[in-house]
Regions:
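Core transmembrane alpha-helical segments of multi-pass membrane transporters/permeases
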Residues: 1-28, 41, 45, 217-268, ...
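Membrane-interfacial loop-to-helix junctions in multi-pass transporters
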Residues: 2-8, 33-49, 77-86, 167-173, ...
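Hydrophobic alpha-helical transmembrane segments of multi-pass integral membrane proteins
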Residues: 9-17, 40-71, 256, 272, ...
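Inter-helical loop and helix-membrane interface segments of multi-pass membrane transporters/permeases
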Residues: 28-42, 81-86, 144-169, 209-238, ...
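Re-entrant/interfacial helical elements at transmembrane boundaries that shape
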Residues: 63-74, 91, 104-116, 304-318, ...
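Juxtamembrane and boundary regions of transmembrane helices in multi-pass small-molecule transporters
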Residues: 99-102, 110-162, 350-394
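Flexible hinge motifs at transmembrane-helix junctions and intramembrane kinks/re-entrant loops
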Residues: 176-220, 387-389
Length: 394
């Protein structure tokens, strides 16, 4: 994959979507109704399932975090659910879809690099991701039980509801931008037109329903939504988005793309590959070595857009030599790339996740077991040989 394609237009446009949906009242109305309908005890599993559906249908974990994820974090704050736990539920759902949906880049890139049919590779990835996801969903239910006896109300709860209702005109009509985006997703329209339509719908609703001028809409798109509501809690929930909030993440994306080529030229990857070949005395040691190799290389570069083609391209021929199907490599890279990414704070995905949800990577990682349990399952499968697909005889 060429480094010049590392930064994609839709990634830069996500925070424009967040800004316009804040100004239009779309996210505030989702927070308002979410606090009215959801209970603290059921909040975490419901959030996990919602983000799973959104990510699987939309084919983007980043888009899920920026839309449903942002709204859910606001609801969590209002219901008194710890923000790290809420972020963990959001990430579990968002990155499950990113690993097992045929729409995101991650499965498509890994399937292409490994030269395996996309759906075959996804089904094989479910061997590790599926159990890890189910355990995470059960964890959400069990952890949420400690809040099931709590009453909905209190000073913060009432402060959020009253402030949001005072600052915005609230109506189900404000959910129109969400409806537009969901319909286009279900129609399998390309990502960029879908986000443009969502941004445009949000801008129109902001002008018609909230009285925001076109000049202010453009300002929100560039520097984010900013309002002094008189409530510090509500300000922290709503004041976000805008192109400038993505600059640090875009910088990391560019740096990762630039960093990948020198690593190849300097022979760093060759040294790591030589290490794998040296310890690869059996199929099990080879499989474990590849897991370690990709995890280390991804952690160094911080971008699986770089690690997938570089590492995958260099080790894919090892698998036929050991009579293993290359879809094992696809699963290994998804688990140590897409799964690991949100927990690595200096990675592009990790930086974006922490910035968007407002919770540090180390804080939410324990509440998103799927991210690291899938790696644990992959290691177990590599060591025991369980769940390892053999190469088909020609």
């Amino acid at each position: 994959m060429e480094e010049k394609r590392i930064v994609k237009p839709w990634q830069a446009g996500l925070m424009l979507l967040v800004g316009t949906w804040m100004a239009s009242g779309t996210v505030p109305v989702m927070i308002y109704y979410g606090m009215k309908v959801l209970t603290p005890g059921l909040f975490l599993p419901v959030v996990c399932i919602l983000c799973t559906l959104m990510s699987t249908m939309a084919g983007t974990s980043w888009g899920t975090l920026a839309t449903v994820g942002v709204a859910c974090m606001g609801v969590a704050q209002g219901l008194g659910v710890p923000l790290p736990a809420a972020a963990g539920a959001v990430c579990t759902g968002a990155f499950f879809g990113d690993k097992v949906s045929p729409l995101p880049d991650s499965p498509v890139i890994t399937a292409t690099v490994c030269e395996v049919p996309l759906m075959d590779g996804i089904r094989h990835a479910l061997i590790s991701t599926g159990p890890a996801y189910l355990i995470s969903l059960v964890f959400c239910f069990v952890y949420g039980l400690r809040y099931s006896g709590g009453s909905v109300g209190g000073e913060v709860y009432e402060d959020i509801l009253s402030t949001v209702s005072a600052e915005f005109w609230l109506s189900p009509v404000l959910l129109l931008p969400v409806l537009v985006a969901v319909v286009l997703i279900l129609m399998k329209k390309p990502t960029i037109p879908t986000f443009i339509a969502g941004i445009a719908a949000g801008a129109v609703m902001a002008m018609l329903c909230q009285g925001v001028s076109l000049h202010d809409i453009l300002t929100v798109m560039y520097s984010g939504f900013s309002a002094d509501t008189g409530s510090d809690v509500v300000n922290s929930m709503l004041n976000r988005g805008g192109f400038t909030s993505m600059l640090s993440t875009i910088g990391l994306l560019i740096a990762a793309g630039i960093f990948g080529a020198p690593l190849r030229k300097a022979g760093v990857v060759d040294v790591l590959l030589a290490f794998v070949e040296r310890i690869a005395k059996t199929t099990r040691s080879m499989s474990l070595g590849v897991l370690i190799l990709h995890a280390v290389f991804f952690t160094i570069t911080g971008a699986y857009y770089v690690s997938y083609p570089v590492v995958g391209g260099m080790v894919k021929d090892l698998y036929p030599e050991y009579h293993l199907d290359r879809k094992n490599l696809m699963r290994a890279m998804l688990d140590t790339g897409t799964g690991l990414a949100p927990m690595v704070s200096w990675s592009t995905t990790g930086s974006y996740t922490a910035t968007t949800l407002g919770v540090s990577n180390l804080a939410f990682a324990p509440f998103a077991p799927m991210l690291w349990l899938s790696i644990v399952f992959s290691v177990i499968y590599a060591v025991t040989g369980i769940g390892t697909a053999k190469a088909k005889e020609n």
